[in-house]
Amino acid sequence: MAEPLLVVGLGNPGDNYARTRHNVGFMVADLLAARMGSKFKAHKRSGAEIVSGRLAGRSVVVAKPRCYMNESGRQVGPLAKFYSVPPGDIIVIHDDLDLDFGRIRLKIGGGEGGHNGLRSVSNALGSKDFQRVRIGIGRPPGRKDPAAFVLENFTSTERADVPTICEQAADATELLIELGLEPAQNRVHAW
């Protein structure tokens, strides 16, 4: 039997961060778990919360690291090892300052764009060659510090669109699982 794909939503644990821009990865992971009809449970060896089952016809483990974003690799690395998942079979869902709010893009590899959660995952895996579902949160206004911006809640105007954006990101993740990168990019990047 083929090893599962590992889908990781990045975010920060705790109610204080639940509605922040940095937590869209967690929001999408929650939607994927609901689509699988499962609830997250603790994975003792890694410390992350996981759901395992089928998604888009494949065996999948969806994970939410329960450490802070900048330390995500500390739990993603052990999960990948436990399930024998190579970097190319890992999908990381994360916020992206370099994309306009609501834009979704798929890619594999590349730089981290200053995203310390991605950097932590890359370091833990010893590779940047994992798949990514990038969810645009836009740039901070004026001279606002990007580190502070990502930890703020969405504005009331943005908040109205977040559920739809997260549903689209979950759809994009399922297309990536079902079709592979290039065919999924062709569809998602046309949205």
From Swiss-Prot:
Domain of life of the source: Bacteria
One GO location term (cellular component): cytoplasm
Residues that coordinate or bind tRNA: Y17, Y68, N70, N116
Active site: H22 (proton acceptor)
Site residues, Discriminates between blocked and unblocked aminoacyl-tRNA: N12
Site (Stabilizes the basic form of H active site to accept a proton): D95
Catalytic activity annotation: an N-acyl-L-alpha-aminoacyl-tRNA + H2O = an N-acyl-L-amino acid + a tRNA + H(+)
Annotated keywords: Cytoplasm, Hydrolase, RNA-binding, tRNA-binding
Primary enzyme class: hydrolase
GO molecular function: peptidyl-tRNA hydrolase activity; tRNA binding
Subcellular location: Cytoplasm
Record keyword Cytoplasm present: yes
GO term, biological process aspect, one: protein quality control for misfolded or incompletely synthesized proteins
One Pfam family per UniProt: Pept_tRNA_hydro
EC number(s) reported in the record: 3.1.1.29
UniProt cross-references to CDD domains, sorted A to Z: PTH
Record note on quaternary structure: Monomer.
Function: Hydrolyzes ribosome-free peptidyl-tRNAs (with 1 or more amino acids incorporated), which drop off the ribosome during protein synthesis, or as a result of ribosome stalling.
Family classification: Belongs to the PTH family.
Name of protein: Peptidyl-tRNA hydrolase
